[in-house]
From Swiss-Prot:
Biological role: Catalyzes the conversion of dihydroorotate to orotate with quinone as electron acceptor.
Cofactor(s) required, per the database record: FMN
Name listed for the protein in its UniProt record: Dihydroorotate dehydrogenase (quinone)
Domain of life: Bacteria
GO terms (BP aspect): 'de novo' pyrimidine nucleobase biosynthetic process; 'de novo' UMP biosynthetic process
InterPro entries: Aldolase_TIM, DHO_dehydrogenase, Dihydroorotate_DH_2, Dihydroorotate_DH_cat, Dihydroorotate_DH_CS
HAMAP family in alphabetical order: DHO_dh_type2
Name of the gene this protein is made from: pyrD
Cofactor note: Binds 1 FMN per subunit.
MF-aspect GO terms: dihydroorotate dehydrogenase (quinone) activity
Sites where the protein binds substrate: 72, 117-121, 182, 187, 253-254
Pathway involvement of the protein, from the record: Pyrimidine metabolism; UMP biosynthesis via de novo pathway; orotate from (S)-dihydroorotate (quinone route): step 1/1
Length: 377
C-alpha cells in the first residue's frame, strides 16, 4: 500500500509533530480546491445504509468520527470530514490560549502501533477557535457534524476551574453539535482529579446551567473519562452522568500505563511522561466500555475511542455498547483511506451478523436479550 510505503520510508523518520503539521496543511490545501471536498466525500464517505445511525437528534452517516486532538483549532473540519469521518471532534480547547508543553512532545511507538503525547492542550483558546468555527458555520451552515471538546487552562488555579470551563461552554453553545467536558488528559497537572464525583458534580452542573442560560438546553453534553480509573470510579461517574441528565460518556482518553509494550523499555522510559494511545489501549478501553454499558444500559450514548484499528475493533465496540466510535492513532498508522476501510468493513460485518442497521447491534454482547432484525436475514 502506498501510504504504508511512505510512512515507513519517510514519515516515521520525521518528527511526529512536524509530520502532523505538514500533512494536515497539505490536506487543508487540497480541500481548498473548489469541488474537492464534495468529490472526496462522495468517494470516501460512508454510503452504506446499514451505517446510518440517529444520535443527538442528528443522522450520522456512519459511526466513525475523528477523536479530539487532531484538529485542536477547527482549522480543517471540512477537509477531515471529506476523508470519510461521520463527525469531527475539535479540541481540546481551553478558556485561554496556551502553547502547551515544550517540544518534543509527540512520539511514535511504531512496534506497538501507538503514540505517546504530552501536548498539554496547546490551542488558540476558546475565543479564537469559536470565531473560526462560527465563520465555518456561516459558510457551510450545519451540514457537517462537529463536536467540541473543552478542557482547563493550565495556568488557571483549581479553584477557578469551573469558571474556565464555563467560559468555553458559553462561547461554543450555539456552534457545537455536542459538547465534551474533558477531565481525563494526563498532560495537565491535576486535571484527572476532576473525575472524582465530588468535584465533577459542580463542574458538570455549571456547564449544563450555562448551556441552559445560553438557550441551548438541548445541546448534548458528554464527559470524557480515563482508562486508568478504578472500576468503582467508573461506576460513580456513570451514575453521576445519569443523575445529572448528561447525554453520554466518551470512553476512553489516553493511558499513563506502559504495560505490555513491544518497544524496548529503555526507549519508552527515555520518552518521558505522556498519554499513550493506539493498539495497546484496545483491551482496557473495551473493558471500560462494557462496564459502562452494563451500568447505564441505553440511558446514555456511549462513544468508544482507544485502540480501534480495524473494522473488527469498531464492530466489537458497537456490540459492546458504543453507538459511535472514534479514532486518531488509527488514522496515523492507517493513512487517509482508513476511515473508508473501517466504515465499509463495519457495514459488511453488520450484514454478516444479520443486522439491518448498526443501531440494532449496539450493546448486544452486553445485553443478551437484543437480537438481529429478522427482516435482514
Amino acid at each position: 500500500m502506498l501510504y504504508q510505503f511512505i510512512f515507513h520510508t519517510l514519515l516515521r523518520r520525521v518528527d511526529a509533530e512536524r509530520a502532523h503539521r505538514v500533512s494536515f496543511a497539505g490536506l487543508r490545501a487540497l480541500a481548498a480546491v473548489p469541488g474537492t471536498t464534495r468529490l472526496m466525500r462522495r468517494v470516501l464517505g460512508p454510503r452504506e445504509p446499514e451505517l446510518r445511525v440517529r444520535v443527538f437528534g442528528r443522522e450520522f452517516p456512519g459511526p466513525l468520527g475523528l477523536a479530539a486532538g487532531f484538529d485542536k483549532n477547527a482549522r480543517g473540519v471540512a477537509a477531515l470530514t471529506a476523508l470519510g469521518f461521520s463527525h469531527v471532534e475539535i479540541g481540546t480547547v481551553t478558556g485561554q490560549p496556551q502553547p502547551g508543553n515544550p517540544r518534543p512532545r509527540l512520539f511514535r511507538l511504531v512496534a506497538d502501533r501507538a503514540i505517546v503525547n504530552r501536548m498539554g492542550f496547546n490551542n488558540e483558546g476558546s475565543q479564537a477557535v469559536s470565531e473560526r468555527l462560527r465563520a465555518h458555520r456561516a459558510r457551510r451552515a450545519r451540514d457537517l457534524i462537529v463536536g467540541v471538546n473543552i478542557g482547563k487552562t493550565k495556568v488557571v488555579p483549581d479553584s477557578d476551574a469551573v469558571a474556565d470551563y464555563v467560559t468555553s461552554a458559553r462561547r461554543f453553545a450555539d456552534l457545537a453539535d455536542y459538547l465534551v467536558v474533558n477531565v481525563s488528559s494526563p498532560n495537565t497537572p491535576g486535571l484527572r482529579d476532576l473525575q472524582a464525583t465530588e468535584r465533577l458534580r459542580p463542574l458538570l452542573s455549571a456547564v449544563r446551567r450555562t448551556l441552559d442560560e445560553a438557550g441551548r438546553p438541548d445541546l448534548p453534553l458528554l464527559v470524557k473519562i480515563a482508562p486508568d480509573l478504578a472500576d468503582e470510579d467508573i461506576d460513580a461517574v456513570a451514575d453521576l452522568a445519569v443523575e445529572l441528565g448528561l447525554d453520554g460518556i466518551i470512553a476512553t482518553n489516553t493511558t499513563v500505563s506502559r504495560d505490555g509494550l513491544a518497544t524496548d523499555p529503555e526507549e519508552v522510559a527515555a520518552l518521558g511522561a505522556g498519554g499513550l494511545s493506539g493498539a495497546p489501549l484496545k483491551e482496557r478501553a473495551l473493558q471500560v466500555l462494557r462496564r459502562l454499558r452494563a451500568r447505564v444500559g441505553d440511558r446514555l450514548v456511549l462513544i468508544a475511542v482507544g485502540g480501534i484499528e480495524t473494522p473488527e475493533d469498531a464492530w466489537a465496540r458497537i456490540r459492546a455498547g458504543a453507538t459511535l466510535v472514534q479514532g486518531y492513532t488509527g488514522l496515523i498508522y492507517g493513512g487517509p483511506l482508513w476511515p473508508r476501510r473501517i466504515h465499509r468493513g463495519v457495514a459488511a460485518l453488520a450484514r454478516r451478523d444479520g443486522f439491518a442497521s448498526i443501531a440494532e447491534a449496539v450493546g448486544v454482547d452486553v445485553d443478551p436479550s437484543a437480537k438481529p432484525s429478522t427482516a435482514s436475514s
